[in-house]
UniProtKB/Swiss-Prot annotation:
It comes from Staphylococcus aureus (strain USA300). In the C-terminal section; belongs to the prokaryotic molybdopterin-containing oxidoreductase family. [4Fe-4S] cluster 4 binds at C264, C267, C271, C299. PANTHER family: FORMATE DEHYDROGENASE H, RESPIRATORY NITRATE REDUCTASE. It catalyses: formate + NAD(+) = CO2 + NADH. This is Putative formate dehydrogenase SAUSA300_2258. Residues 257-313 form the 4Fe-4S Mo/W bis-MGD-type domain. One of its GO terms (molecular function) is formate dehydrogenase (NAD+) activity.
Length: 984
């Protein structure tokens, strides 16, 4: 087999691998060829024609040429230069050069840079204004008069994000980008991911925050300076002086526009990007091809929802309650109050009378210090985090079967899989960038997507097959499918023999899991389950993703175990494109648990009850550690009611809204002797506190986050803390020192060094190795070697073998006669969790102003209600009043309530957890949020819709197509390929 081909480039021979993109090869040799429509994250689009070169004597586009034979390539002869100039002239016919007064003149305008690098001095075709106005959406705007029709935005929308909203109407006299069937941006199905603005090579598609703000002389139009620009063009011998002026102005901008690499503070995907700031103003968020988790993709929150950073509701001074009212105080007083109360409670009731809840929004280093504060300084293991509310059952299931509590591969593997199975995950709204990778794999590469969910969300709509089991019955069909695969000799016997223990015992436990049993339990027809089982067994590679629809059940641990059992039986571990993916909900919920903010585990999931583990930490900490596992979140609340817990310190967590059965939780808060809350805002939970400490968000500190794929990434401080707020790690250090300890960390890197010394899972992690966009996926060996795919050398048990885990099922779903409606709940794309951060961005709030309840058309008809009706939902634990959105995303007596009730403005009004109960998964104490029933009372029969009429949910209008459909451009009567004009 031929390994390399000879390519002669401008007279010099090179050995090149077959399949290499010619344009990429030319660039790799530091040879300049213009390529305005090409983007390395998207590949060839073929609209601009600027990348023409001569290949074996013929002028062709280099961007779409694959090196599949020996070639002679010329980039410099006259014919090539003439063809390139013709293409560049056509671009300037569509785009006015007013660089010095353009907000996009920041050194990265690809039109400016290309014209300058090519040496263009004059344009042949005069710029022609088009008969269109600018179109403004909430977050970005489109200027048709600057658009060169490169189609990058279309490619991004159609084939990268796969939101399928944007296209080019090539049939017009003056083609332009349109949204849906030619409606304004704000009336379209656009989900505001912002990737169109990210990839635009010029100022045609641009973030609203950039407009009029980026340059020294910019305004929203060229304005009065346009005449000067035209005069300069005519007076100067070429464009060189004009570019020199704009380059100087762009260089000046660097003095006031700061570009800082950070990691998104919302979901668990772990998107990284540069945030552009001018003073405290956030101009834009710019992802990079080097971003390891997301590449150039973002969602509306990561790209645009940064209003919380400069919100006027930010806490800037400590608050201490005096005579029932909060008063601003200096840090010294607040720290004294905390130290005095912690000391008094510990002396009176013992260390286990104090409890600590860590934040999945904070950094790894801060989570580590929170548990260190609890264990070293106070002497208790009463420390936990919000993985208790969502992901603990998934971790339990994976610990049982494969030994590591994390995704078994990378996000890339989700794209490589032949089959993706989504169970109880609203991926397109909870993890939108991951969903885009899977939608792309399905659309372009034939991946099969199977969705099991009680709600018809976007991924269910797009699925090759969609199954709607009864609530909480996934374990039944998972085990029945596994049994069928084994019974019909479809299991991977070789894989099981080499890599899996306990097969015989496990197989016996499957005896009752017949397909008939599964159909009765789940309501999914036996024939559909059989077909799924056969496809799953025969697929070359399978990944299974799951989230809160599985974990937030009273059998969440067992259902998660059943998922891993199925993957083991089919041999879908230890290979690219396979494995288990419990999609983590928060930006650092994985890392928070990794750092030991758990009652029974210290860093890296080392048992606090193990003598050798405690001895290691005791040597580092200089104190004896409590050998008894502490209380988890659920047990803390119970302990408060039982008089065992007297103090609670929590940060970055609105527990009084997000815990289940919040009437019970709030009643517990009122019983506490002393409560400390640390947050950006005076949250609903903070209103119960005795001391509230002002904390700094992610843009105001350094640190690391660990995402859902176990990827550890650095974030860099972009802004100074607002007012007297402080990073959480500095606050913990101040409290520890006020209590008599001598913590002396100067920078979070020192904290991570300590973690690495104590934690085999993070042994080789250091800030040097995480510089810039570099990342590591744990476990990380001391030499820095990481594991993007787990278990290649064996599973995380002593003998290297996985374990099949026997299960049973008696969790039939039965609807209560009185509480006859099943309440489902979860996230929305625009908001995160309770919405404390996202509601601070006005345009996010404009898109989704309040929480609501989704009701099926059949239930609405049965109760005689319509869109906008107001209803009261009543469960055994509480009641909530919400407005109705009628939609076929839910069916029958299933309803869906988003989590975002804007608690800072509305308190607990409309909060889903007024309805949830205190039932939990028996192995992890994770609340059974998804196992809630209620009855419905009608307050008003109709009203104003709770959704903005322009919200994409109201009227889906997607316009799917493949890429930019450049052939329609080529078919136009006014188009001639530039190469044809110079070919002889």
């Amino acid at each position: 087999m031929q390994e390399h081909l000879v390519v002669t480039l401008d007279g010099k021979d090179y050995l090149v691998e077959p399949g290499t993109n010619l344009l990429e090869f030319i660039k790799s040799q530091d040879t300049f060829v213009p390529s305005i429509c090409y983007n390395e994250s998207m590949g060839p689009i073929q609209t601009c024609d600027t990348c023409t070169v001569e290949i074996d004597g013929k002028i062709e586009r280099s961007c779409s040429t694959v090196i599949d034979r020996p070639m002679t390539v010329n980039t410099v002869n006259n014919d090539v230069k003439d063809a390139q100039k013709e293409a560049l002239d056509r671009i300037l016919e569509k785009h006015m050069l007013y660089c010095t007064v353009c907000d996009y003149n920041n050194g990265d305008c690809e039109i400016h840079n290309t014209m300058d690098a090519w040496g263009l001095q004059h344009q042949t075709y005069e710029y022609k204004e088009k008969p269109y106005e600018k179109d403004y959406g909430p977050f970005y705007r489109y200027d048709p008069n600057q658009c060169i029709l490169c189609g990058r935005c279309v490619e991004a929308c159609q084939d990268i994000e796969v939101n399928e909203t944007i296209r080019i109407d090539w049939d017009r006299e003056h083609p332009r980008v349109i949204w849906d069937n030619d409606v304004p941006i704000n009336e379209s199905s656009c989900v505001s991911c912002g990737q169109c603005a990210t990839v635009c090579p010029c100022n045609a598609m641009m973030e609203v925050n950039m407009e009029g703000n980026a340059g020294y002389m910019t305004d929203t139009e060229p304005g009065s300076l346009a005449a000067m620009i035209d005069l300069t063009k005519k007076a100067e011998p070429g464009y060189g002086p004009l570019f020199a002026i704009s380059d100087s102005e762009a260089e000046m901008r660097k003095e006031r526009i700061k570009k800082t690499k950070t990691v998104c503070t919302y979901c668990g995907v772990g998107c990284s990007f540069e945030v552009w700031t001018k003073d405290r103003e956030i101009l834009k968020v710019q992802p990079s091809h080097d971003s390891p988790a997301n590449k150039i993709a973002t969602c509306v929150k990561g790209k645009f929802s940064w209003g919380h950073i400069n919100s006027d509701q930010r806490l800037t001074k400590p608050l201490v309650r005096k005579n029932g009212e909060f008063h601003e105080v200096e840090w010294d007083e607040a720290l004294n109050v905390i130290a005095d109360n912690f000391t008094a409670i510990k002396e009176k009731h013992g260390p286990d009378a104090l409890s600590f809840i860590s934040s999945s929004k904070a950094t790894n280093e801060e989570s580590y210090l929170m548990q260190k504060l609890a264990r070293q300084v106070i002497g208790t293991n009463n420390v936990d985090n919000c993985s208790r509310y969502c992901q603990a059952p998934a971790t339990k299931g994976l610990f049982r079967t494969v030994g590591h509590g994390g995704d078994s591969g990378s996000i890339e593997d989700l794209e490589k899989a032949a089959m993706s199975v989504l169970i109880g995950t609203n991926t397109a709204e909870a993890h939108p960038v991951i969903a885009s990778r899977m939608k792309r794999a399905q659309k372009l590469f034939g991946q099969k997507i199977h969705v099991f969910d009680i709600r018809k969300h976007e991924m269910a709509e797009r699925a090759d097959r969609f199954y709607q089991p009864k609530p909480g019955t996934d374990l039944a069909w998972l085990s029945a499918v596994t049994k069928y695969i084994i019974d019909h000799d479809l299991h991977d016997k070789a894989f099981i023999d080499e890599w899996v223990d306990d097969f015989d015992e496990y197989y016996k436990s499957l005896e009752t899991f017949t397909m008939a049993f599964a159909e009765e339990a789940t309501g999914i027809p036996e024939s559909e389950l059989i077909k799924f089982a056969e496809e799953c067994a025969k697929a070359e590679s399978v990944v299974i993703c799951w989230a809160m629809g599985i974990t937030q059940q009273d059998i969440g641990s067992d259902s998660s175990t059943a998922i891993s059992n199925l993957l083991l039986v089919t041999g879908n571990y230890r290979r690219p494109g396979t494995g288990a993916y419990p999609l983590r909900g928060h930006n650092n919920v994985q890392g928070c648990s990794d750092m030991g903010s758990m009652p029974d585990k210290i860093t890296g999931y080392q048992s606090i009850e193990a003598d050798d583990i405690r001895a290691k930490f005791e040597k580092e900490y200089g104190v004896k550690l409590n050998p008894k596992a502490g209380k988890d979140n659920h047990e803390m609340v119970e302990g408060i009611h039982d008089g065992e817990v007297h103090s609670l310190y929590l940060y970055g967590e609105d527990t009084g809204i997000v815990d289940s059965n919040i009437n019970f939780v709030q009643a517990a808060f009122e019983k506490l002797d002393f409560m400390v809350v640390q947050d950006e805002f005076l949250t609903f939970t903070a209103t119960y506190a005795d001391v509230v400490l002002p904390a700094s968000p992610s843009l105001e500190k350094d640190g690391t986050f660990t995402n859902t794929e176990r990827r550890i990434q650095r974030l860099y401080q972009a802004l100074e803390p607002l007012g007297d707020s402080k990073p959480d790690w500095k606050i913990f250090q101040a409290i520890a020192n006020r209590l008599g300890f001598d913590w002396n960390y100067k920078h979070p890197s020192e904290i991570m060094d300590e973690v690495a010394r104590l934690t085999p899972l993070y042994a080789g992690v250091s800030y040097d190795r995480l510089e810039g966009f570099n990342s590591l996926q744990w476990p990380v060996q001391p030499d820095g070697t990481d594991e993007p795919i787990l278990y290649l050398e064996g599973f995380n048990f002593d003998n290297g073998k996985a374990k099949l885990f026997p299960l049973s099922f008696d969790n039939y779903f039965k609807q209560d006669e009185i509480y006859d409606i099943h309440v489902n709940n979860g996230r929305l794309l625009e908001h995160f969790h309770e919405g404390n951060m996202t509601y601070q961005t006005p345009m996010i709030k404009y898109k989704v102003p309040r929480a609501f309840v989704e009701i099926s058309p059949e239930l609405a008809e049965d109760r005689g209600i319509h869109e906008g009706a107001e209803v009261k939902l009543i469960s055994e634990t509480g009641e909530a009043v919400l407005q109705v959105h009628v939609t076929d995303r839910v069916k029958g007596k299933e309803i869906y309530i988003p989590l975002n009730n804007d608690a800072m403005e509305n308190g607990d009004l409309g909060a889903i957890n007024l309805l949830t109960n205190s039932d939990v998964d028996q192995y992890t104490d994770t609340p059974s949020y998804k196992r809630t029933s209620c009855r419905l009372e009608v307050i008003t029969k109709r009203g104003k819709s709770p959704l903005n009429p322009n919200n994409f949910r109201v009227n889906k209008k997607r316009q799917p197509q493949y890429s930019v459909q450049v052939q329609k451009k080529w078919e136009r009567s006014d188009y001639v390929f530039p190469g044809n004009q110079v070919d002889k």
